[in-house]
From Swiss-Prot:
Main location: plastid
GO biological process: DNA-templated transcription
Protein name per the record: DNA-directed RNA polymerase subunit beta''
Needed cofactors: Zn(2+)
Organism: Oenothera elata subsp. hookeri
Cellular compartment(s): Plastid, Chloroplast
Length: 1383
C-alpha cells in the first residue's frame, strides 16, 4: 500500500451500501491493482470471522411482534364499519375494496416497521435479524412474513385478493389462508421457470436494437442538454444521475465559475453541487447527441468499468442492452420469493401539530365538496390553501397543496396528530396503474330502479347500457318472478284449447310456487305467434304465462300475454285474459272447458264498443276437422272500424259477422297431413274401414272414402265418412262441387230418409273420365241460442240500463263459410264464441267520458278477501295523454274535497263509515272532477251495494290494538289487503296503489333534500300464502311476505300525525337503512314505501347500490334482474402489485410501447396535442420540427422514468445512460404524414428525425411528419441494414422486400459484419473503418439570433414564440436551419 496516505481508523458496522462506497473511493485513490489487493484481504477476514461465529436459524428465533394483536383487531374493526356503510349504500364496491386494501396494507406496513426496533431492543444478535439485513439472502419483507403477518396476496393476474392473511408463517395459517397463500407461492415457483426465458428473450431484442451503436467521435458539438434539479429528486438518485456524466454548460455561483462545459462529473463535484444548492444543472446525455447512428464520448460520459471517459470504439449499445436485460434474468432466479405478497402505496396525510381550532378561507373558488377515493365526504382544494390551527398559546400555519382533500370543516376542533388532509399522489410518481373494470352483481332478484337521470352511452344508443352523470343510488326492489325452467315453447295458436298433457312441465314448476297445492288450479295461456303463412315452419318461442287462482277469489289473478317482439303489431297484445268460473266446475276438472274470460287492455282503458269478455259455450265445440256451412248468406258487420285513439293501440271489437240466421252446419272429416317422404298404404278414392293403417305409424279413426292430394308441404290425406251412391240417369244432380241438403228437404219416400233427418252434404267425385259417383256425407247442425242469460253471470244491477253502461251480447262463428277447419293434436275446436261488448250512452253529463277505466279492487269482508273488477267512466288526468303532466290532478282522487287528511297527492279524501252489521262486502268509488259519474261493478257477491258521491264523511279510527312503538312486524300467514291482520283504516291510500296505472308517473318529491323519481306499479294482487302478484307488462313479480315490513309511526292524535308524516314519507319514496322516518329512531331496513297509512307505513325491502359518475348501469328502468346479473360496472385505476415477476413484463410492455396502462394512453394524447398546437403556432416548416422534437423529448424522459421505477422498486441499480440509449433508438423515428405530399418520402414511411430535418433543409420545402413511438421489435425491423433485420425475424419477407427495393447495406453495424464474416467496427477493428470527416469544421459557427431563441423554446419555454415568428424565415434560410441543427 502507499505509505504516504493518512489512514483513518473507523469503528462502525458496515453494510452493503457502505462497502460499495468504500470500494469506489479506494479505486479513486489507489487505482485498480491496489484496490483488488485490499479487497482480497477483506474477503479473507470475512470468511475467518464467519467461520468462527457461525449462526444457525431455528424456529425459536422467530419472535412475533407484541403489538400485532391490537393492530389486527383495529383493522378488523375498520373493515366491519366499512361493510356496514356499503350495506347502507353510503360507499360503493370499488371504494370499499380500495379502502380495505389500504387498511390492511397500512397495518402490515406498520408491523413491518415495528419489527426492526423490536428485534433491536429485545435481541440484536437474533440470527433472523442479522440475516435479513446482511443482503445475503432474504430481505425485510420476507422476514416480516415470518414474524409479522403475510398480509394481502395477489392472484395470478396480479389482482388483489381482498381477504388478508392475518397469520404469519411462525403461527401457521388456517385452511382458507393456506389456499390463498398457495396462489402467490405457486405463482413464484412457476414464474421462476417461465420468466427466465422471457428475460433472455428480452435481452436478445434489446441488443438487436442497439448493436450498431459504437462510440465513434469525441465531440458531436451539441449545445443541448437535459436539466437536472437537486430540489426535485432524492439526494441518492440525484448523485446516481450525475456521477459519470458530462456538463453541457458552465456552472456559476454568482459570478464565479465552479465547473466548465464538457467537464465530467465526479463525486467531489456532485457534493459541491449539493452543498451550494445550485439551480438546475444541464448535462449531456445520449438523447442530445447529434450523430445519427452512433454516439460521441462526451454525450456518453464515463466508462462504467473504470472512472475515465469512454474509449473510442467501445460497443456501448451492446453493453446497454445487456445491462437492462441481465438483472431481469438474475431477479427471476432469486428463489426466496415474496410469494405474490401484494405491495402498494398509501396516501400521504397532513396531521394536526397540536390541539386547537382549525380555520381556513372557505371560498368556493378555493375549495368545493367532493368524495375521497374511499367515499368519505371531503373538500377538494383547487390551489394552495393556508390553514391555521389556533391552540391556547400558539398559532400553527400549514399549507395544503392543490388537489388535496381536506377532511375537516372550517372552525372545527382538531386533536393533535389528527389527519386533517390527504395529499393526492401526483402524476410525478409513476405508479404502475391500470384501468380495471369492476362488475357489481346483484345478490337477490328483484326490480331495478334508479334515482337520477342517466345518459345512454354514445356507442350503444339503443341498448341497455347507461352512463350515470352524477352520484346516485340504484335500487333492487325485492320480489321474485314466475319464470318457467324449461324453454317455454308452445305450438298452440291463439284461442286454442290446450291439452292438459302438454303442460305438465310448467304445472310441476307452478305447484312448487303455491303454499297449498290442493287449492291451486291453473289455466295456461300461450301467446299467439303464428305469423304469416310463410313463417309457419319456424314458430317463435313464446312464454307461457300462468294464471293462478285460489278458491276464495271470484276473479282469477291475471297475467300478461307476452309476445314475440317481431310480431307485436299483429298480435293480440295489450290484453289480459281472465277466466271467470264457478268453484264447483273448477273442482270437477283440471282445465274447465267453459267459462267467461275477461279481456283487459294492459293500461286498463276501454274504448267504446270494445270487447269486455268472451264466453266459449261447450255446446259449440267439436273434436274433428271439417267445414262450416251457413244456411243463408245474409250477415252484416256490427261495428264500423274506428280510428284507434290511444297510442298503445287498444284493440276495439273486430268487425266479425253477426248472424241473421239461427243455425249453421258442420261437415266433419278426418284429415292427416303427412310428410312427403312417408309411404302411404292406401290408394286414392279407395274405401277403408275404421282403424285401418294408412301410413307407417298412422291409423284412421273413421271409415270412409280416402282422397290423397299432394301439396307443397306434404301429402294431405282426407277421409270422408258417408255413403256412396252411383247415380242413375233419372237422378239429376247438379254439377257443382257440393250441395248442402238441410234436414227435412230430402225425398220422403226414399230409403235413406231416416239417415237424412240431420241433413246431408252431397259431393260429386269423378275418379276416372267415364264413371262418377256421389258421396253423401253426414252433417252436424248447430242451433244458435238466443244468447246467455246475463243474470246468471253478473249481478242484476249490471243488466239495468240506468247506469249508462251496457253489455251487448254478440255470437259469432269463428270460421268463415266453407272454410276448412283443421284440428291440431287432439285439441277441440270452438266453433262459436260469444262476445260481451262494452258500450255506454253518450249522456250530456258524461259526454267527456271517451273511455272506461278498469281496475281491480280487493275488499275484505269478514276475513275473506274478494277481488272485484271495477269499470268506471272516469276521465282521469293520468290516463289522458294530453293532461298527463298536469300538476293539479296528480292521482285518480279529486283534489276538490277539503279535508284535513290531505297528506300527499296519493292520500284519498273521502272516508267511509263501516257498519259491519248491515253489509258483508263494501266497495268505494273514486270521485272524478264532475263528482257525478256513476261506476259499474262486476261483483260476485250478491249483497254488495254501490255508494254515490259523498262529502264530509268522517272516518273513525278503528285500530284498537295496542302496538309497540317502532316495532317491525313481519307479515306472515295473515289475511287482509297485502297480508295485514289489522284492519286498514284508510283503505283508499292502499286502493290507490292497487289501481294506479303503469304510466311512468315521474314526480320529483322533495324529501330530505333528495330528489327521487319513482314509479307506482299498476296493481298488486295477493294470494293466500302472502305472495303478491304484480302483473307488470314486462314480467310477473311475486312479492313474499318476507319482503315487506310494517313500520308503525307513533301518533298522539289524528291531526298531528298527518302533519308529521307529510314532512317525511311519501308513497314510492326510497328509504335507506339507518335513515330516520320518525322521531323515535332510525329505520332498520332499506326499502320503498308501498302504503302510507295514518299510523303505519308498509315498506317493500330493497337493496341500494351506490354508483358514482362515469359508472355504467346495465338494464332498463323497472327491469327484472335475477340473482347474479350485472347491475353496474365501475371503471377505476388501481396499482398493480410490485413483484418483479410483474416488473419484467412491465419493462417489456414499456419497451414494446404497448398501450395497456393509462400512462401510455396519456402519452399518446399528449403527443397528439403537442403536434396540433405547435404547428398552428409556428407555421409549417418549424412547426413539424419543433412539434416532433418536443414530443420526442417528453416521451423519452417519461419512458426512462417508468423503466427505472420498476427496477428501483426491486432494489436494482441501472445507470440511466443504458436505458437512454435504448429509448433513443425506439423514439428516433418519425412518420411521414399523408397530408403534405413530398417528392422524397412515401406517405406513412418511417424515417429518422435527423434525416427528415436535413432533407427538409436541403430541399427548402416542408415535409409533413409526426413523432412516432416504435417498440423494440419494430425498431429492429426498421433499421438501415437489411442483413441485420433478416437475421432477427421474418427472414424471407425482409430479404424479398430489400431485393425489390434494391436496398444497399453499408455494413455499419456489428451484426451485419459478423453475418458476412467481416471485421466488426469496434475495439481494434474500429481504427481502420473510420475516416475523420473534416467537413463540419469548415462550416463557420454563425452566432445568429436564432440559436438562443430556439433553445429557450425547446427546453425552458421561457419566452413566447413571437420573437421567432416576427423575424422573417426566408432572409437566411440555410444559415438559420444549419444553426438550429447545431444547437
Amino acid at each position: 500500500m502507499d505509505e504516504g496516505v493518512n489512514l483513518v481508523f473507523h469503528k462502525k458496522v458496515i453494510d452493503g451500501t457502505a462497502i460499495k462506497r468504500l470500494i469506489s473511493r479506494l479505486i479513486d485513490h489507489f487505482g485498480m491493482a491496489h484496490t483488488s489487493h485490499i479487497l482480497d484481504q477483506v474477503k479473507t477476514l470475512g470468511f475467518q470471522q464467519a467461520t468462527a461465529t457461525s449462526i444457525s436459524l431455528g424456529i425459536d428465533d422467530l419472535l412475533t411482534i407484541p403489538s400485532k394483536g391490537w393492530l389486527v383487531q383495529d383493522a378488523e374493526q375498520q373493515s366491519l364499519s366499512l361493510e356496514k356503510h356499503h350495506h347502507y349504500g353510503n360507499v360503493h364496491a370499488v371504494e370499499k375494496l380500495r379502502q380495505s386494501i389500504e387498511v390492511w396494507y397500512a397495518t402490515s406496513e406498520y408491523l413491518r416497521q415495528e419489527m426492526n426496533p423490536n428485534f433491536r431492543m429485545t435481541d440484536p444478535f437474533n440470527p433472523v435479524h442479522i440475516m435479513s439485513f446482511s443482503g445475503a439472502r432474504g430481505n425485510a419483507s420476507q422476514v416480516h412474513q415470518l414474524v409479522g403477518m403475510r398480509g394481502l396476496m395477489s392472484d395470478p393476474q396480479g389482482q388483489m385478493i381482498d381477504l388478508p392473511i392475518q397469520s404469519n408463517l411462525r403461527e401457521g395459517l388456517s385452511l382458507t389462508e393456506y389456499i390463498i397463500s398457495c396462489y402467490g407461492a405457486r405463482k413464484g415457483v412457476v414464474d421462476t421457470a417461465v420468466r427466465t426465458s422471457d428475460a433472455g428473450y428480452l435481452t436478445r431484442r434489446l441488443v438487436e436494437v442497439v448493436q450498431h451503436i459504437v462510440v465513434r467521435r469525441t465531440d458531436c458539438g451539441t449545445l443541448r442538454g437535459i436539466s437536472v434539479s437537486p430540489r426535485r429528486m432524492p439526494e441518492r438518485i440525484f448523485i446516481q444521475t450525475l456521477i459519470g456524466r458530462v456538463l453541457a454548460d458552465d456552472i456559476y455561483i454568482g459570478s464565479r465559475c465552479i465547473a466548465i462545459r464538457n467537464q465530467d462529473i465526479g463525486i467531489g463535484l456532485v457534493n459541491r453541487f449539493i452543498t451550494f444548492r445550485i439551480q438546475p444543472i444541464s448535462i449531456r446525455t445520449p438523447f442530445t447527441c447529434r450523430s445519427t447512428s452512433w454516439i460521441c464520448r462526451l454525450c456518453y460520459g464515463r466508462s462504467p468499468t473504470h472512472g475515465d471517459l469512454v474509449e473510442l470504439g467501445e460497443a456501448v449499445g451492446i453493453i446497454a442492452g445487456q445491462s437492462i436485460g441481465e438483472p431481469g434474468t438474475q431477479l427471476t432466479l432469486r428463489t426466496f420469493h415474496t410469494g405474490g405478497v401484494f405491495t402498494g402505496g398509501t396516501a400521504e396525510h397532513v396531521r394536526a401539530p397540536s390541539n386547537g381550532k382549525i380555520k381556513f378561507n372557505f371560498n368556493e373558488a378555493l375549495v368545493h365538496p367532493a368524495r375521497t377515493r374511499h367515499g368519505h365526504p371531503a373538500l377538494l382544494c383547487s390551489m394552495d390553501l393556508d390553514v391555521t390551527i389556533e391552540s391556547e398559546d400558539i398559532l400553527h400555519n400549514l399549507t395544503i397543496p392543490p388537489k388535496s382533500f381536506l377532511l375537516v370543516q372550517n372552525n372545527q376542533y382538531v386533536e393533535s396528530e389528527q389527519v386533517i388532509a390527504e395529499i393526492c399522489a401526483g402524476t410525478s410518481t409513476f405508479h404502475f396503474k391500470e384501468r380495471v373494470r369492476k362488475h357489481i352483481y346483484s345478490d337477490s332478484e328483484g326490480e331495478m330502479h334508479w334515482s337520477t337521470d342517466v345518459y345512454h352511452a354514445p356507442e350503444f344508443t339503443y341498448s341497455n347500457v347507461h352512463l350515470l352523470p352524477k352520484t346516485s343510488h340504484l335500487w333492487i326492489l325485492s320480489g321474485g318472478s314466475c319464470r318457467s325452467r324449461g324453454a317455454p315453447f308452445s305450438l298452440h295458436k291463439d284461442q286454442d284449447q290446450m291439452n292438459p298433457r302438454s303442460t305438465e312441465r310448467e304445472r310441476r314448476y307452478l305447484s312448487s310456487l303455491s303454499a297449498n297445492n290442493d287449492q291451486i288450479r291453473y289455466k295456461f295461456f300461450s301467446s299467439s305467434f303464428s305469423g304469416k303463412k310463410k313463417d309457419d315452419r319456424s314458430p317463435g318461442y313464446s312464454e307461457m304465462n300462468r294464471i293462478i287462482c285460489t278458491l276464495h277469489c271470484n276473479l282469477i289473478y291475471p297475467s300478461i300475454l307476452r309476445e314475440n317482439s317481431d310480431l307485436l303489431a299483429k298480435r293480440r297484445r295489450n290484453r289480459l285474459v281472465i277466466p271467470v268460473q264457478s268453484s264447483q266446475e273448477r273442482e270437477k276438472e283440471l282445465i274447465p272447458h267453459s267459462g267467461i274470460s275477461i279481456e283487459l287492455p294492459i293500461n286498463g282503458i276501454f274504448r267504446k264498443k270494445s270487447i269486455l269478455a268472451f264466453f266459449d259455450d261447450p255446446r259449440y265445440r267439436t273434436k274433428s276437422s271439417g267445414i262450416t256451412q251457413y244456411e243463408t248468406m245474409g250477415m252484416h258487420s256490427i261495428v264500423k272500424k274506428e280510428g284507434l285513439v290511444d297510442y298503445r293501440g287498444i284493440n276495439e271489437f273486430k268487425p266479425k259477422y253477426q248472424m241473421t240466421i239461427d243455425r249453421f252446419f258442420f261437415i266433419p272429416e278426418e284429415v292427416h297431413i303427412l310428410p312427403e317422404s312417408s309411404s302411404i298404404m292406401v290408394r286414392n278414392n279407395s274405401l277403408i274401414g275404421v282403424d285401418t293403417r294408412i301410413a307407417l305409424n298412422t291409423r284412421s279413426r273413421a271409415g270412409g272414402l280416402v282422397r290423397v292430394e299432394r301439396k307443397k308441404r306434404g301429402i294431405a290425406l282426407q277421409i270422408f265418412s258417408g255413403t256412396i251412391h252411383f247415380p242413375g240417369e233419372t237422378d239429376k244432380i247438379s254439377w257443382d262441387s257440393g250441395i248442402l241438403i238441410p234436414p227435412g228437404t230430402g225425398k220422403r219416400n226414399s230409403k235413406e230418409s231416416k239417415k237424412w233427418k240431420n241433413g246431408i252434404y252431397v259431393q260429386r267425385i269423378t275418379p276416372t273420365k267415364k264413371k262418377h259417383f256421389v258421396l253423401f256425407r253426414p252433417v252436424v247442425t248447430y242451433e244458435i241460442a238466443d244468447g246467455l242469460n246475463l243474470a246468471r253471470l253478473f249481478p242484476p244491477d249490471l243488466c239495468q240500463e240506468k247506469d249508462n253502461m251496457q253489455l251487448q251480447i254478440v255470437n259469432y262463428i269463428v270460421y268463415g263459410n266453407g272454410k276448412p277447419i283443421r284440428e291440431i293434436s287432439d285439441t277441440s275446436i270452438q266453433l262459436v264464441r260469444t262476445w260481451f261488448i262494452l258500450n255506454w250512452d253518450q249522456d250530456k253529463k258524461s259526454a267527456s267520458a271517451e273511455a272506461a277505466h278498469a281496475s281491480f279492487v280487493e275488499v275484505r269482508a269478514k276475513g275473506l278477501i274478494r277481488d272485484f273488477l271495477r269499470i268506471d267512466l272516469v276521465k282521469s288526468p293520468i290516463l289522458d295523454p294530453r293532461k298527463r303532466n298536469d300538476p293539479s290532478g296528480s292521482g285518480l282522487i279529486s283534489d276538490n274535497v277539503s279535508d284535513h287528511t290531505n297528506i300527499n297527492p296519493f292520500y284519498s279524501k273521502p272516508k267511509m263509515k263501516q257498519s259491519p252489521r248491515q253489509n258483508h262486502g263494501t266497495i268505494r268509488t273514486l270521485l272524478n272532477q264532475n263528482k257525478e259519474c256513476p261506476s259499474l261493478m262486476i261483483l260476485s257477491a250478491s249483497n254488495c251495494f254501490r255508494m254515490g258521491p259523498f262529502n264530509d264523511v268522517k272516518s273513525q279510527n278503528v285500530i284498537k290494538e295496542s302496538i309497540k312503538k317502532d316495532a317491525i312486524i313481519q307479515i306472515r300467514n295473515s289475511i287482509g289487503p297485502l297480508g295485514t291482520a289489522l284492519q286498514v283504516v284508510n283503505f283508499d291510500s292502499f286502493y290507490y296503489f292497487i289501481t294506479h296505472n303503469q304510466v311512468l308517473l315521474t314526480k320529483y318529491l322533495q324529501v330530505e333534500n333528495l330528489k327521487q323519481t319513482f314509479q307506482v306499479l299498476q296493481y298488486y294482487l295477493m294470494d293466500e300464502s302472502g305472495r303478491i302478484y304484480n302483473p307488470d307488462p314486462r314480467s310477473n313479480i311475486v312479492l313474499n311476505s318476507f319482503n315487506l315490513s310494517w313500520y308503525f309511526l307513533p301518533h298522539n292524535n289524528y291531526e298531528n300525525s298527518c302533519e308529521e308524516i307529510s314532512t317525511i314519507v311519501s308513497l314510492g319514496q326510497f328509504i335507506c337503512e339507518n335513515g330516520c322516518i320518525a322521531k323515535n329512531g332510525p329505520y332498520l331496513r332499506s326499502g320503498q314505501v308501498l302504503i302510507v297509512q295514518l299510523d303505519s307505513v308498509v315498506i317493500r325491502s330493497a337493496k341500494p347500490y351506490l354508483a358514482t359518475p362515469g359508472a355504467t348501469v346495465h338494464g332498463h328502468y323497472g327491469e327484472i334482474l335475477y340473482d347474479g346479473d350485472t347491475v353496474v360496472t365501475f371503471l377505476y385505476e388501481k396499482s398493480r402489485s410490485g413483484d418483479i415477476t410483474q416488473g419484467l413484463p412491465k419493462v417489456e410492455q414499456v419497451l414494446e410501447v404497448r398501450s395497456v396502462d393509462s400512462i401510455s394512453v396519456n402519452l399518446e394524447k399528449r403527443v397528439e396535442n403537442w403536434n396540433e398546437h405547435i404547428t398552428r403556432i409556428l407555421g409549417f416548416p418549424w412547426g413539424f420540427l419543433i412539434g416532433a422534437e418536443l414530443t420526442i423529448v417528453q416521451s423519452r424522459i417519461s419512458l426512462v422514468n417508468k423503466i427505472q421505477k420498476v427496477y428501483r422498486s426491486q432494489g436494482v441499480q441501472i445507470h440511466n445512460r443504458h436505458i437512454e440509449i435504448i429509448v433513443r433508438q425506439i423514439t428516433s423515428k418519425v412518420l411521414v404524414s399523408e397530408d403534405g405530399m413530398s417528392n422524397v418520402f412515401l406517405p406513412r414511411e418511417l424515417i429518422g428525425l435527423l434525416r427528415a430535418e436535413r432533407t427538409g433543409r436541403a430541399l427548402e420545402e416542408s415535409i409533413c411528419y409526426k413523432a412516432f413511438l416504435l417498440g423494440i421489435t419494430r425498431t429492429s425491423l426498421n433499421t438501415q441494414s437489411f442483413i441485420s433485420e433478416a437475421s432477427f425475424q421474418e427472414t424471407a419477407r425482409v430479404l424479398a422486400k430489400a431485393a425489390l427495393r434494391g436496398r444497399i447495406d453499408w455494413l455499419k453495424g456489428l451484426k451485419e459484419n459478423v453475418v458476412i464474416g467481416g471485421m466488426i467496427p469496434v475495439g481494434t477493428g474500429f481504427k481502420g473503418l473510420v475516416h475523420c470527416s473534416k467537413q463540419h469544421k469548415s462550416i463557420p459557427k454563425n452566432k445568429h439570433f436564432f440559436e438562443g431563441e430556439i433553445r429557450d423554446i425547446l427546453f425552458h419555454h421561457r419566452e413566447l414564440f413571437d420573437s421567432c415568428i416576427s423575424k422573417n424565415f426566408h432572409d437566411t434560410p440555410e444559415q438559420s436551419f444549419r444553426v438550429f441543427n447545431d444547437s
